[in-house]
């Protein structure tokens, strides 16, 4: 609990703390962190720079309130189409993690036509979305790791898949 409280210094940490507290079986702390994060987001729902920090917040909501999680996911998926590759990688990894918590086989989403899996009927297969985000993260990880001469980005993706 104290470790989580020490992380509350920034909005990113508040959002991430909600996810980690929920995953650790601390729903009261998670709910408190979520409330704080929602307050910090008020009036800033269109700030695309937040994409880097929203993935685990989406995961928290897919664990606790899937409809709210998908509201954030719709917005962030749109942002992810026109962001830099680092934010795209991080968001894709976080969506791979988040989608583990969606138990329905299909979801109804309002996604932009530019989204590679766009469907006019708005019905998306959760497993197909998971594959899309995994493949995107994997492709970017391979490029970053080749550039860096190590396996750090793929290691992160493998860790997400193994948890």
Identify the residue ranges that each predicted region occupies.
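C-terminal non-catalytic interaction modules
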Residues: 81-163
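Single conserved hydrophobic/aromatic residue that forms the stacking wall/gate
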Residues: 1-14
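TPR-repeat structural position
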Residues: 27, 66-67
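Structural motif corresponding to the intra-repeat A-B loop/turn of tetratricopeptide repeats
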Residues: 24, 63-64
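Alpha-helical junction/boundary sensor with strong preference for TPR arrays
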Residues: 5, 34-45, 79-83, 141-148
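TPR repeat positional signature
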Residues: 14, 54, 92-95
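Residue-level signature for tetratricopeptide repeat
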Residues: 19-20, 59-61
């Amino acid at each position: 609990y104290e470790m989580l409280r020490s992380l509350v210094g920034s909005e990113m940490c508040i959002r991430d703390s909600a996810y980690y507290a929920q995953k650790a079986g601390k729903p009261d702390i998670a709910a408190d962190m979520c409330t704080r994060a929602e307050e910090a987001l008020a009036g800033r729902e269109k700030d695309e720079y937040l994409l880097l920090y929203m993935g685990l917040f989406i995961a928290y909501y897919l664990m606790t309130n899937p409809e709210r999680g998908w509201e954030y996911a719709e917005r962030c998926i749109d942002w992810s189409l026109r962001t830099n590759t680092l934010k795209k990688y991080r968001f894709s990894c976080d969506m791979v993690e988040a989608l583990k918590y969606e138990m329905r086989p299909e979801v109804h989403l309002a996604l932009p036509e530019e989204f590679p899996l766009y469907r006019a009927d708005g019905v998306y297969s959760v497993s197909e979305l998971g594959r899309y985000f995994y493949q995107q993260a994997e492709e970017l990880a391979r490029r970053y790791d080749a550039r860096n001469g190590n396996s750090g980005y793929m290691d992160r993706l493998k860790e997400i898949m193994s948890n």
